[in-house]
UniProtKB/Swiss-Prot annotation:
<keyword id="KW-0055">Arginine biosynthesis</keyword>
<feature type="binding site">
    <location>
        <begin position="56"/>
        <end position="59"/>
    </location>
    <ligand>
        <name>carbamoyl phosphate</name>
    </ligand>
</feature>
<dbReference type="InterPro" id="IPR002292">
    <property type="entry name" value="Orn/put_carbamltrans"/>
</dbReference>
<dbReference type="InterPro" id="IPR006131">
    <property type="entry name" value="Asp_carbamoyltransf_Asp/Orn-bd"/>
</dbReference>
<dbReference type="Pfam" id="PF00185">
    <property type="entry name" value="OTCace"/>
</dbReference>
<comment type="similarity">
    <text>Belongs to the aspartate/ornithine carbamoyltransferase superfamily. OTCase family.</text>
</comment>
<feature type="binding site">
    <location>
        <begin position="273"/>
        <end position="274"/>
    </location>
    <ligand>
        <name>carbamoyl phosphate</name>
    </ligand>
</feature>
<dbReference type="GO" id="GO:0005737">
    <property type="term" value="C:cytoplasm"/>
</dbReference>
<feature type="binding site">
    <location>
        <position position="231"/>
    </location>
    <ligand>
        <name>L-ornithine</name>
    </ligand>
</feature>
<dbReference type="InterPro" id="IPR024904">
    <property type="entry name" value="OTCase_ArgI"/>
</dbReference>
<feature type="binding site">
    <location>
        <position position="167"/>
    </location>
    <ligand>
        <name>L-ornithine</name>
    </ligand>
</feature>
<feature type="binding site">
    <location>
        <begin position="134"/>
        <end position="137"/>
    </location>
    <ligand>
        <name>carbamoyl phosphate</name>
    </ligand>
</feature>
<dbReference type="GO" id="GO:0006526">
    <property type="term" value="P:L-arginine biosynthetic process"/>
</dbReference>
<dbReference type="InterPro" id="IPR006130">
    <property type="entry name" value="Asp/Orn_carbamoylTrfase"/>
</dbReference>
<feature type="binding site">
    <location>
        <position position="83"/>
    </location>
    <ligand>
        <name>carbamoyl phosphate</name>
    </ligand>
</feature>
<dbReference type="GO" id="GO:0042450">
    <property type="term" value="P:arginine biosynthetic process via ornithine"/>
</dbReference>
<keyword id="KW-0028">Amino-acid biosynthesis</keyword>
Amino acid sequence: MQNLRNRSFLTLLDFSQKEVEFLLNLSEDLKRAKYAGIEQQKLKGKNIALIFEKDSTRTRCAFETAAYDQGAHVTYLGPTGSQMGKKESAKDTARVLGGMYDGIEYRGFSQRTVEELAKYSGVPVWNGLTDEDHPTQVLADFLTAKEVLKKPYHEINFTYVGDGRNNVANALMQGAAIMGMTFHLVCPKELNPTDELLNRCKEIAAKNGGEILVTDDIDEGVKGSDVIYTDVWVSMGEPDEVWEKRIKLLEPYRVTKEMMEKTGNPRAIFEHCLPSFHDTETKIGKEIQEKYGLTEMEVADEVFESEQSVVFQEAENRAHTIKAVMVATLGE
């Protein structure tokens, strides 16, 4: 058993393969216990602060339900719910909350902010998403892949298609390197990850028997994949000119039925962190259709709704994996 007590969870790069595997195995155990109705509460009497500078469905619900299942109490501080960054620095907020709470989750913009919270609060801090990283998401992604494919992690061929610089792509590449996977990042050259992160991940992968390939060649990149993963192309709030340029760059990289077939693997699955623009059933989806004439963006609705799509199992697993992180770092 790995001792992660009082550790913060800021990036997967802070953890060894054994530690990440321990969290994934614990996630499986906690999920089984919940389904069997025999879950033991390890967080009784704990108070947890959830700081959200960005709105959220899955991350917030996962942290809240996981905490409640384990007997903890939570306080939600939304985008307008605290003074952090406005009247009070992250350093000061950390020291205030650290005196009242046993653990802190942060979902926001800056990786530096979550690092400051961890440095000055004196309690475990968990990264629920920053512009650079999304480590809790990757635990759910990997757990889902193992459940469906029934393969050990190091045998999974994992492929991300789309914007190679975004936080999910960064986090997946880190996680795959640590777990010794074959990881392909398929994206336009203009959207390649930073050399610094890529080189570091390649070094880690080599030590763990994994391999990382970055390519703009879709056929080469998806061949042999067990998992095809994508994420939204543009973040909300980015100007129209960014949307236009990004859509033009990434339209060839939309995950379609043809792309899934190019894997040559009939058992290949589709993953997405959600939300997804796969139809026009949302306000944003309708705006995309009106402005750009598209009824789907990063993934075809045909794939999203197919039997190969495991996105809702993946979403549920956010709760089980986040619960594992909290229990491992804060549990009695």
